[in-house]
Amino acid sequence: MNLSRVLGIGLTTAAAAWFASSSVACGTDSVNNKDYGQPPDAGIFNPGSSGGGDGYGSSGGVAPFVCPDELKACSHEFTYPFAGETSVELRGDFGGPDTWQAGVPMKRDGAVWKATTNVPFGKPVQFKFYVNGAEWKVDPAQPTVTDASSNTNNTFAGKTCEPAVCNEIGPLPTGVFDWRDSVMYFVFVDRFLDGNGANNCNVAGTSGPIANYQGGDWAGVRQKITEGYFNDLGVNTLWITVPFNNPDVTGQGVGGDTHQYSGYHGYWPKIDANDPASLAHEGCFGSFAELKGLVDDAHAKGIKVLIDYAMVHVHSSSALFSAHSDWFWPNNNGKGGNCICGEGCSWDAMPDRERCWFTGYLPHWNYTNPAARDYSVTNAVEWVKQTGVDGFRADAIKHVDISWLNELRSRIKTDITAKQTPPQRFYMVGETYDFGNRDVLKSYVDPSTKLDGQFDFPLRKVLVESVLMRTVKMSDLANFMNGNEYFYGANAVMSTFVGNHDLPRVIHLAANSRLWGDNQASDGKDRSWANQPTIPAEREAFERLANAFAVLMTNRGAPLIYYGDEIGLPGAGDPDNRRFMQWTGLNGNQTFLRDRMKKLGKIREAHPALRRGSRSTITADDDLWVYTRTTTGDTVYVAINRGDGDKTATGLPGGSLDELVTGTPATGPNVTIPARQARIFVAK
């Protein structure tokens, strides 16, 4: 299907709707469940070879690109009878409110005035005729309707067509950040860089250094912001770990994990018991002024900041829990046992998942209690007001009553967005740890009332299996992405990724001899504390990981870089996947990957077609995927070869091409793509 950008009046309504919407996964280091800590056991979660009915699978050719109905349009001819007029202009709601003000000039064809324009797919249209530049008229021979303002307009019930035009949401107003342009970097603060040794912490009783604070802080993040480290990668958004104060105690894991951990990760919040506007920050990361300085420094470099917001629970030592225990679900499954997730209560079934305690020391908020909900939402809004952050990463969102999310979005609009000039879109991205059930992820996505997007776990599954592990075909990836592109809605901005803090380091899935076999969702816990893996020696692993990032950096969404993945940092499951960042002594493979990441980031930054617009597959087979991405004024060709031998990309434009990754001259329409390499072209 060919897709075209909205020209002039195109999708004013859709763009306005998007703009108006703005108007612990993770937590403890040992949790074993689908939303917190580590991937599910294969015996519990098995989406099947079909990918859970999400369009993933390859038999035959590549399925067509799927366009959502709200972006579809059909060509339609309007007519008006000639009666001596000198000019007639078609006006109406077919292009949003603007086309009532400036419509489409009609041309006379004998006894009839005619105009052909696109109308929304399957939606009723109201229209009228502006005659001789002075008078509004209807055609009495066509159906009419009286609108809410008592105006009589012509109307028709709507039109469908196949193929339809697939429009694109146009640019946002000047000064409004477009989250489609986001490239995100997850800074795991405690493991990133120690910028101020004076605030280093040590909690007695942990099972080892990897389970304790290691000195990373906000001062270290500020240092790298100032040095331009993130800008060099093409990153314009930082996600930083939970900034809340955590208790200086240890806690045991779950699921049989008897190791003792500190709260270095931030997911054991202590919240003020009396005033939700009194923000208790994590002193091991620095002062509150240091956190505010981090946000200011980032903004000065053109970088947005998200904070990880932990809203599922508090730590049992929190004074808030002592003062308001009725704001939390009792640890009682009603069957004579505890309601611990996975032990007496279900992680996934309702209502258990919205009330079970992740561990015996993490009481679960009861947001069906209005007082509890209001207190928590007010606290969240205060973090925005007092720090100036631009969004939230919503932790383990499926464990939260939806009323909390609805109220938060409403309060963000009234308390934050409405007071900005110009109003910005406050970006909220959720974490729902599910590789197969896209409907669950989608149920929390609606930029006007809920999340802007989620981390795309189902895409991660197919991406890793196709590009890194090579257990499915590149045509499978093309098929999946064609059906996934707008699955979560036209206005959603999903965050695409290959690695995060709950999965083993992804470099090991790209190795010639993969750790954990064919299971992309392995938790890697078998080597978290002993026999910890070293960095792969072969260049091939780093080339494959670069290819995975090439897919992310040349397609829609907000690509995520988990700290250290840009250098192939090794590590097994949690907590070994949270090693301290390596800043010196990089080997040649690590330098290659980091340099390639910089190049991909800059290419994405320079070409809007890679961030929005449409994708059309030229060819896709077992090892090679060639596609074009197009938006107004920009067309880019991408060829990704995951195979271990050279492949020929066909169907590229004839003549000289600029190759953007290596700068090597190329001539189309046929170009050789080296083994395990991605090439990005523009026609000269």
Where does each model-flagged region fall?
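Active-site-proximal helices and loops of the catalytic beta/alpha 8
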Residues: V295, H299, I303, H313, ...
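C-terminal beta-strand-rich structural cap/linker in extracellular carbohydrate-active enzymes
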Residues: G668-K684
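Ser/Thr-rich, Pro/Gly/Ala-heavy low-complexity intrinsically disordered linkers and tails
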Residues: L3, L11, A15-D69, C161
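Substrate-binding/active-site clefts of carbohydrate-active enzymes
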Residues: V176-S182, D190-T387, W404-T421, F426-T432, ...
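N-terminal module-boundary/linker segments of secreted carbohydrate-active enzymes
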Residues: A63-F78, E162-F192, E382
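Asparagine-centered strand-capping/turn motif at beta-strand->loop junctions
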Residues: A639-G643
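Beta-strand-rich binding/interaction modules
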Residues: V88-D93, G645-T662
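Aromatic-rich carbohydrate-binding modules that target alpha-glucans
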Residues: P68-P124, Y130-K159
